[in-house]
A protein has these predicted regions:
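Internal alpha/beta domain cores that form substrate/cofactor-binding pockets in large enzymes
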Residues: 61
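Conserved phosphotransfer microenvironments
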Residues: 55-58
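STAS-like cytosolic regulatory interaction modules
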Residues: 1-52, 64-120
Length: 120
């Protein structure tokens, strides 16, 4: 998997993913998720709109990031998730699934809602 874009936003860290050769290790994704988790932002948004499928390694990395962010009271939000990618991720289900939303605007709303819920 190739991370084609990353941006530190006011309330989140955005990663946009693109497919790479299937035999390549997921080092770029692992590094980018690690940086995103260390950003201190309340949410990490991962745009999956360019992906056609998800490798087992990528699914494990996303699940791991999801659990680590939850421990820090942060959130992994997957955006523009194609049905095949969702299926690849959920077949490795390791507890409650990460939040999946159709658009970046929905991701912003989800992040704001979580922030409001934590403030109460």
């Amino acid at each position: 998997m190739t991370v084609v874009y990353h941006e530190l936003l006011p309330d989140s860290y955005l990663l946009i993913l693109a497919p790479s050769r299937s035999d390549e290790p997921e080092a770029a994704l692992a590094h980018s998720l690690h940086c995103a988790q260390r950003s201190g932002k309340p949410a990490v948004w991962v745009d999956c709109g360019m992906l056609h499928s998800l490798s087992d390694e990528a699914a494990q990395l996303l699940w791991g990031a999801h659990h680590q962010l939850e421990e820090k009271h942060s959130q992994l939000v997957l955006v523009h998730v194609p049905e095949r990618v969702k299926k690849d991720l959920l077949k490795r289900e390791l507890g409650p699934a990460p939040c999946m939303v159709p658009t970046l605007l929905d991701a912003a709303r989800q992040t704001a809602q979580q922030r409001d819920d934590q403030a109460v």
